[in-house]
Amino acid sequence: MIRFVLQKIKNKKWLTTCLLLGLVFLVAAVSCQPMFKAGSLNKMLLDSFHNAGEEAEAYPTVIGRTGAYVTEKRQTAAAVLDGVKGYQQTWEKYLGSIKAVNTQTILTLDEQSAQGAYGGKGKYLRVSYMPDMLAHTQVLVGEDYDAYAENLYGCMLSESVMDACGFTVGETLEFPLWTDAGGETLKLQICGIFKETDSTDTFWYTAPNTMEQEMFVSEETFDAIVKQFAPEKINYATNVLLDYTKINQKNVADVQYYIEQFHKEDESFTDSFLNLLKQYQKDKKTIDITLWVLELPLLGLVLAFIYMVTGQIIDTEQGEIAMMRSRGYRRSQIVALYALQACILCLVAMLIGTPLGYGLCKLAASTTDFLTFHAGNLSMYHFTPVMLVYGLAASAVGILFILIPVVIHSGVSIVQQKSDQKINKKMFWEKYFLDIVLLGVSIYLLHNFNQEIDKIRARALLGAKMDPLIFLDSVLFIVAMGLVVLRLLHYLVQLVYHIGRKKWRPAVYASFLQITRNFRKQGFISVFLILTVAMGLFNANAARTINQNYENRIRYADGADIRLQETWKMQAFYVSANDIDYNYVEPDPVKYDEPVKQGLCTSMAKVIRTNNISVSRGKTKIANCEFMGIHTKDFGETAYLQEELNRDVHWYTYLNELAQQENGVILSKNLAAALEVKVGDVVDCSRYGDSVMKKETVRGTISGKVVAVVDAWPGFVQYTYEDGEETEHYLIVANYAKTVQSFKISPYEIWYKLADGVDSDAVRAVIDASGTKLSAYTALDRDIDAMKETAMIRITNGMFTLSFVIALILCMIGFLIYWISSIRQRELLFGVYRAMGLSEKEINRMLVNEHLFSTLPSILAGGACGGVATYLFVRLFGVIYLPQKHNLSIYVYLDQMDVLKLVAVLMVMILLCIVILRRLVRSLNITQALKLGEE
């Protein structure tokens, strides 16, 4: 039987090769899913750790404990450290492969009042000991405590303690309330001032500049003080920095479980990343659903291709099947024969498809946009054994789809076969109007989704998993509309045929006859072509819309190409016994002009920003408004506002109005509505004191005349969200000079507009070279790149691109299969036409006409279906990906380049197919066919 099957494969080598190709793509598409999922989850997890570290400016994955041991049980630092080490060993035992990259443990005695011998400020300080500290410190003044050789106990202070207390090296610190049994007070001599050797050293999880009460002594000194002064307890705080690169999608659930158990069993246990792990579990569900939902249309197309090719094979072997039945073969034997053939093909498909799936996953992971690739870091996407299991499951489904037409045709006898050939049956969906029903169901679901769009947005904001039915409904709509359009095309072709059937030339008449009589056979490839074009266009538009709206919101929120703010010094002073005032010391502003002078930037603007503002009119008062003080000319040349927001009145008009009114202010629309004011009214803008002052102290007030009310403004985000809770913000903009006059000079941001071809790193290098210490930094290009690197965006772009590429390849092959089979089957008919007097040119013209009234309408219909689906569904997709309320509405983008890419690829496909078909027609043994036709 195996030999017979191999002979069958050899006899139908081209169709079998196409079937094998379909199985290969099925195995590849399914087997790449676990690899893509694992890589995406690992990347999402790693990105969450990186982002958390950058936001907190601290190492992201830390576990620890704070506590104390009574000195009756543990009287030395070593004994306390042994106790702490016991906890650390317990954590290490359960966390397994998640090793520590560093550990910081601090032992302290209770704080006591200290007084410097040179009259430094009295302050409560703690005697502290930190193991291995000297290996990570740099002594700025004096010497470390190991080199200290005086009679008094020696200690080291950080720069922050020295600055806060005014102590100096060599000064003796006395603790008058801390006495030993003989009544002698504790005295420490400052032997050195230190700072960390490297600010990026993970040893310093708690940095020296944040330790404002610690005096560090050696272990021997610490033990001697404990022994002499007998404190009640020794406090400790230990922080273990875990290697987060070892936390991945395989072990993250175990890590989360053990961290939760540590908290449950030990109230003093602390961690910095449990919330990240919980958020990961929520996002994981979304990624699981998104991957499958985005891949289902592709799997449907591949399975349809397999079914179509199998149908072509069965059509050519119907006579053979009927003969086998007439010779006594049972249906089960015939099905078993084809099942064996399918198993052989699936085995080969596994060998080819699994490595191909690996390559396709790498391809999908490298996408930054639809059909746009960037070879970045793909190390997290690697082979996983589960791919083989998925490949086997895909092979089983492929075998099932191969056997469906076999089972249908295996019971046909020779008599039934001959009679069926004379009947031009309607397709099932056409006969029972299934296309109309499915289209109605899809539109009904779409209507329901649009009615519940606020609920969908709310669920997305709360982190609930997305509803896959929304994505599946878009696929259902495209399929149903494709079938409806195909039905209409059939009616249209019949209408054109009937209108001109008495006028058509023979070649044209024959082509219309071929189209109308073979609609069932040709309909399948037409549907495949329509779906490929429609889904390709829809995927391109959906990906472009999601990407561009993300980018627009980032661009709007950033306001300019670069925003930075330097750390300013605050000088506070008493104005009375109970009141404090302060002045800010402005850093040298000359260095900010350097990027413009070097041609890296075209403009620069100073922007005073604060949200410590209240705006009032009459008895109505709105607190915590966002305030901007701007130079209108510089701001207009530097800031950016999307064109969509400038359609009615360009925002430069508002800047001109503000420039003409010294005390003018611009209000956001929601603030104007809350205060019930309009242009020309006057509002009071009061600024409150910063951290060292009481918040109710008004630092200054501007009585401003409203010159404009705006819906949007560069850098102003009206709504922000935290844990699903919405917070609305208000904006007021004033002139820079009036701001400084009323509120005094205060920290401002520097906004830059980059020159063409310059990236933000070049500007950052210039700023860093000047020694500027920044408290805030935002770069638009980095933010956009980070967005494109997120797991969800990569998955969306990757799956849309992958689906289109595979569908296009299969469409081209399916297109060739149909036309090659059609021409092969019509070789005798061509001979008859030639015998009737048709020339070779007329035969070619007949084929061209068939393409014009079958292939071209299918492509145009696919474009129409994709366009309508884009109009109806893409905005809904945008709400799922971007559920937050925003000053920018979700715009649907139809990029001409995406359409041109699609058209170019389709044209290449069609031209290639036409070239192959022309060569095939020329290679036909037309002389023999002509003789058969004459006979």
Residue ranges and their predicted role:
Residues 12, 304-345, 412-428, 435, ...:
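Interfacial "coupling" helices/loops that link adjacent transmembrane helices in transporter permeases
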Residues 378, 410-429, 884, 919-935:
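Short cytosolic juxtamembrane segments of multi-pass membrane proteins
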